[in-house]
C-alpha cells in the first residue's frame, strides 16, 4: 500500500511539473515563434532584452505562459516593456469565457485585437498572484528596475469561438515628465492624454510585428 502511495504521489508530482513546464515556444533574441494557440511569429525591436518566461496557473482558472522583454537604460531602468502572454482557461472551468467590451480594435498581421489603454503607477493595485504580479516579480528578479509610472496599451486576440483562449500583448512606456494622475480626468495635463495615447498606439503598431505562420 505504501509503495502504491509513493508511486501515485510521484506520478501526480510529475504531472504537475508537466503542466507547469514552459511550452516549446522558440525565443530567439527579439523573436517569439509559437507553433500552436496560435501559430504565430512575433518580432520585437532588436534593442530589447529577453527577461524570461513564467508559466503559472492564474487564480486557479487559467493556464498562463508569460514572456517578458524590456528596453532599459544604462542603470537597468525599464524604459519600455513588451509583455506577451498566451492564456487558456482550464478544462476544469468549462463555463468560463473571456469578455472584452472595448469598442476599439486593431488588426496586425491578420490578427484582430481588442485595444485598451491606460496610465498608472507601477505599484498601483497589483493583486497578489495576478499576471501583473508575476511579470513585475520576474523583471525585478533579473535586476531590472521598474519606473514610477507607465503608459500602456493592451492588445487581446481571442483564438476560438468559445472565447476561452487568448493571445495578449501589452506594450508599456516609462511615463517620463508626468505623474499618472496628471493625465487622468481632472489632472493638470488631462488635455494631453488623447495625443499621448494616439502616439502610443502608433509606436505599438510600429514596434510589434506579428505574422501568422498559418491561418489564424
Q: What do these predicted regions represent?
A:
Residues 2-14:
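Sec-dependent N-terminal signal peptides
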Residues 2, 17-73, 177-216:
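N-terminal targeting sequences that direct proteins away from the cytosol to non-cytosolic compartments
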Residues 5-6, 156, 167, 205-207:
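Small/flexible residues
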